A protein has these predicted regions:
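Bacterial Sec-pathway N-terminal export signals of envelope proteins
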Residues: 40-98, 148, 152-158, 162-164, ...
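Small/polar, glycine/serine/threonine/aspartate-rich low-complexity segments that form flexible
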Residues: 86-145, 277-288, 320-321, 325, ...
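Periplasmic alpha-helical coiled-coil/stalk elements that build and connect Gram-negative outer-membrane
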Residues: 165, 171-295, 407, 452-453, ...
Length: 483
């Protein structure tokens, strides 16, 4: 009951009306001051930082250029199927005599199924025209088709298929380049964040140490404390100031190191704007979860380096089909339907076709096929080599992911211990401060406890930084830093 009465006596009395008005003014001014300081500081979040890199960084642009070049190569490969218009003119005159006068115009279309369609007109006259040519005007429509080698695939179709594959492969190469770039940028970003957080942490403790020094100076002037106590307090201020200056230097150098990732649209680098600060909140929200098995599964399906080799395998599969076709003899059919007076074709009944056509058949076959067999064997060896590389790379990636998982588990345990140490050192400091008020301790012990507490805070920050770096290295190893 006595405690309750004493507690009620400590209840603050209502402020006079004038004091209330002054207090409102102070609060309004304080809010304005805080809002101005907050607006002066610009928080650079990690996602925004990476977006800046993806837009203007030279490596990001180089990666996009590779994609654009592959797209241009694919577009050029389509050119083998462009219709081709040709014209040939040959004329010979001597002593006023026309020996021959040839004018041939032809339109030829290569199709993706291996069939070549053509149509043209010929005009031939002269005293010594070739017997193979039809005197006068001639129109024709014809087809050319391979029946063995080149029926399923030929060089032009293989190039087109491989160009489409290389275009997709360039996208994986871009992801791989950005994955490596993002890792370096993320590591430097969190280093900057940790340094800034250390600086913020130490400035708070520096303020506490200065307040303690001011109180001891007043107590010394009143004769309640000795000169040695003020000297102890001043030494503690100096100690924390040294730590703060070191953290400030690290924060500034870390901020400068981020400039190597910051480029504008004019390909000019720039430094962070004054007042830009990192996302300290995100640094404090360290996610403690084991994603090792999930990331291994993702890496096997989505890792850009493995994707590059898989597309190489697809391109080699096209090459294998082409080389297998080279083992077959060359056999081509040619057929033209003819008509005098250009395109004055009659109805396509049997007598007309039997009497107005031109037919050809080409056949060629090397007797030993050594070149074709050697090329085919080389392609099979390339496929075997690429399969071995994929298996080895997959195992390397899996081991990297697991090793970073082991590292994170160890850091997790250390973080838990560190959090407990912070609480314990804080309690020891509070107990020592209470004992000092009772005259049972010294300022030297207070400083010692405070130094240990600060040391535990900085150690905790260091462990958080190591954990974040390890977590993002694991994402990098899985190839999923870039979506």
């Amino acid at each position: 009951m006595a405690f309750r009465q004493n507690f009620m006596c400590l209840k603050p009395k209502p402020l006079p009306q004038k004091n209330k008005k002054n207090m409102r003014i102070v609060i309004v001014l304080l809010i304005i001051f805080i809002s101005k300081n907050t607006s002066a500081q610009k928080v650079l979040k990690l996602d925004d930082f990476l977006e800046l890199i993806s837009k203007n960084h030279p490596i990001a642009k180089q990666a996009q250029i590779r994609v654009d070049m592959s797209a241009a190569a694919f577009f050029a490969a389509k050119g083998v199927f462009d219709p081709v218009l040709t014209n040939e003119t040959a004329k010979k005159t001597l002593d006023g005599k026309i020996y021959y006068n040839y004018q041939d115009t032809e339109l030829k279309v290569y199709t993706p199924i291996g069939l070549t369609a053509k149509t043209g007109i010929e005009n031939s006259n002269g005293m010594f025209s070739s017997n193979e040519r039809t005197i006068g005007n001639l129109g024709y429509i014809g087809l050319e088709m391979p029946v063995l080698k080149g029926l399923l695939i030929d060089y032009q179709r293989a190039i087109l298929k491989q160009s489409a594959i290389y275009q997709k492969q360039s996208e994986e190469e871009k992801r791989q380049m950005l994955n490596d770039l993002y890792l370096d940028a993320i590591q430097d970003y969190w280093q900057w964040t940790a340094s800034y957080q250390n600086m913020d942490l130490l400035i708070q403790n520096l303020g506490n140490a200065k307040n303690r020094l001011n109180l001891l100076r007043i107590a010394f002037q009143n004769g309640d404390k000795s000169m040695n106590d003020t000297l102890e307090a001043y030494t503690q201020v100096q100690n924390i100031e040294l730590l703060y200056q070191e953290a400030q230097m690290e924060a500034q150098t870390s901020a400068i190191s981020l400039a190597k990732y910051l480029w504008n649209s004019n390909d000019s680098p720039y430094f962070l704007e004054s007042g830009t600060i990192p996302d300290i909140v995100a640094f404090g929200l360290v996610s403690i979860e084991d994603r090792t098995e999930e990331l291994i599964s993702l890496a096997k399906n989505q890792h850009p380096e493995l994707g590059v080799y898989r597309f190489k395998m697809d391109a080699l599969a096209v090459e294998r089909t082409l080389k297998r076709q080279s083992l077959l003899p060359t056999a081509n059919l040619k057929m033209n339907i003819l008509s005098k007076n250009y395109y004055n074709f009659e109805s396509a009944y049997s007598p007309f076709l039997n009497n107005n056509y031109k037919f050809g058949f080409d056949f060629k076959m090397p007797l030993f096929l050594r070149e074709a067999r050697g090329d085919y064997q080389k392609t099979l060896l390339k496929i075997s080599e690429t399969n071995s590389i994929i298996s080895n790379k997959t195992w390397e990636i899996e081991n990297k992911i697991r090793s970073y998982g082991v590292e994170q588990n160890a850091l997790k345990s250390q973080l838990n211990t560190s959090q407990s140490m912070i609480i314990n050192y804080r309690n020891l400091l509070k107990n020592e401060e209470f004992k000092l008020q009772q005259g049972e301790s010294t300022l030297f012990l207070i400083n010692s406890r405070e130094n240990k507490w600060i040391e535990s805070l900085l150690k905790n920050q260091s462990l958080k930084l190591k954990y974040l770096k390890s977590a993002y290295k694991q994402l990098w190893a899985a190839g999923v830093l870039v979506k």
